Amino acid sequence: MSYIPGQPVTAVVQRVEIHKLRQGENLILGFSIGGGIDQDPSQNPFSEDKTDKVNGWDMTMVTHDQARKRLTKRSEEVVRLLVTRQSLQKAVQQSMLS
């Protein structure tokens, strides 16, 4: 899948809903955040996964810090992601060829 940040793309996406964990008075995701337009994509262990939206917000052209702030927003107990997964895209393409 060829992907150019900020450009429209046709892709197979997966919806993911994360309920944040309560740690004292804080809400936490329970995982680390990697990526962003200002980061080296080869350093991301899931570099084929692209988070397209977080709670309806377009994430295709945000920096790492902007993504972190959106994902860790204190007022949101649930994070709804729209994720493009290249492995899912490949599986769908294979099933269509069979």
UniProtKB/Swiss-Prot annotation:
Tissue pattern of expression reads: Detected in kidney distal convoluted tubules (at protein level).
Q: Which GO terms describe its cellular component?
A: cytoplasm; nucleus; plasma membrane
For membrane topology, the record states: Peripheral membrane protein
What keywords are assigned to this protein?
A: Acetylation, Cell membrane, Cytoplasm, Membrane, Nucleus, Wnt signaling pathway
Q: Which GO terms describe its molecular function?
A: beta-catenin binding
Q: Give the N-acetylserine positions (modified residues).
A: S2
Q: Which domain of life is it from?
A: Eukaryota
The keyword Oxidoreductase is annotated on this UniProt entry:
no
Where is it predominantly found?
Answer: cytoplasm
Q: Cellular location of this protein? A: Cytoplasm; Nucleus; Cell membrane
Which residues are in the PDZ domain?
A: 12-87
GO BP annotations of the record are: negative regulation of cell population proliferation; negative regulation of protein localization to cell surface; negative regulation of Wnt signaling pathway; Rho protein signal transduction; Wnt signaling pathway
Q: What does this protein do?
A: May regulate a number of protein-protein interactions by competing for PDZ domain binding sites. Binds CTNNB1 and may thereby act as an inhibitor of the Wnt signaling pathway. Competes with LIN7A for KCNJ4 binding, and thereby promotes KCNJ4 internalization. May play a role in the Rho signaling pathway.
Q: Provide the assembly information.
A: Interacts (via its PDZ domain) with GLS2. Interacts (via its PDZ domain) with RTKN (via the C-terminal region); this interaction facilitates Rho-mediated activation of the FOS serum response element (SRE). Interacts (via PDZ domain) with ARHGEF16. Interacts (via PDZ domain) with KCNJ4 (via C-terminus). Competes with LIN7A for KCNJ4 binding. Interacts (via its PDZ domain) with CTNNB1; this interaction inhibits the transcriptional activity of CTNNB1. Interacts with ADGRB2.
What this protein is called in its record is Tax1-binding protein 3
